[in-house]
Amino acid sequence: MNTKEISKVVDLVRESNPLVHNITNVVVTNFTANGLLALGASPVMAYAKEEVAEMTSIAGALVLNMGTLRPDEVEAMLLAGKSANMNDVPVLFDPVGAGATSYRTEVARHIPAEIELAIIRGNAAEIANVINEKWEIKGVDAGAGNGNVVSIAKQAADELNTVAVITGKEDVVTDGERTIVIRNGHSILTKVTGTGCLLTSVIGAFVAVEKDYAKAAVAALTFYGVAAELAAAKTVEKGPGSFQIEFLNQLANTTSSDIEKYGKIEVI
C-alpha cells in the first residue's frame, strides 16, 4: 500500500458522489454536512426510528456517532445498523467518549455486539474501553493515556472482526493482519470541535467506494491530514476560526496529486 495507490480513492469519491447516512451528534452536524459536501460526497442526517432503516438501505455508508447520546438515538442506531447489515451497506462506528460514563461505555460495547462493523474509529482511550481494556479517559475529547496503541488497534480489529482506526498524533489502521501508520495532520485540528467526527464521516465516503476497508481508511486519513496541513500553512497564525474555513476549502481542493506528494504512510 502506497500513496499512489490510495490517492486514486479520492478521485473515486468525487466521481461517485456517495450518499453517507450520518446518525451523529448535535454539536457537529453542520460541520459534518459541509465537510462531506466539500469533499464531493452527499450527506444525509436522518434520526427518526420510523425512517432510518429505509434511509440506510439506499446509502453508500452508515456512520454511527454517539457524541450526544440519547436512548432514542441508540434505538435509531440499532435499527439503521441492522438495515445496513441486511443491505450490504458498510457501517462505521465512532464511540465518542467510551469510558467516560458507565452508560456511554455500555452503549459503546452494545452496538458492536449487535451490528457488524466495517470500521471502528476513535482515539486510543475510546477503542480500549470498547474492548474492555483499561485506559484512562477524561471527557469525550481525551485520548491521552498509557498503553500500546498498535496493540489495542489489533486487539479491537480481531475481537470486533472489523478494521480498527485509532487517531491521534499518529494514526493507526489495522484489519488485524495489515497495519499502517499515517503521519499527516496538524495540531490545530484539536482546536476546532467536530474534526474527529467529520473524519469518521469522511472515512465513510471513502468506504462507500472502496471495498478494501483498510485501504479506504488509509486513503481517507491521508487525504484528511494533507488537507489539514495545507489549510494550516495558510491560516495557523490567524487562529482556529480561519483554519476551519480554509480546511473546508482544502477538503474541496486537495487532489490525488497532493496525496502522492505529501502523504506519509508506513506499513508496519
Swiss-Prot record:
Substrate binds at residues 45, 194. The keyword Mitochondrion does not apply. ATP binds at residues 121, 167. SUPFAM superfamilies: Ribokinase-like. Signal peptide: none annotated. GO terms for biological process: thiamine biosynthetic process; thiamine diphosphate biosynthetic process. It comes from Bacillus cereus (strain ZK / E33L). One of its GO terms (molecular function) is magnesium ion binding. It holds the Pfam family HK. The gene is thiM. Keywords: ATP-binding, Kinase, Magnesium, Metal-binding, Nucleotide-binding, Thiamine biosynthesis, Transferase. It comes from the Bacteria. Its cofactor is Mg(2+). Pathway: Cofactor biosynthesis; thiamine diphosphate biosynthesis; 4-methyl-5-(2-phosphoethyl)-thiazole from 5-(2-hydroxyethyl)-4-methylthiazole: step 1/1. InterPro entries: Hyethyz_kinase, Ribokinase-like. This is Hydroxyethylthiazole kinase. It catalyses: 5-(2-hydroxyethyl)-4-methylthiazole + ATP = 4-methyl-5-(2-phosphooxyethyl)-thiazole + ADP + H(+). Belongs to the Thz kinase family. The keyword Membrane does not apply. Its EC number is 2.7.1.50.
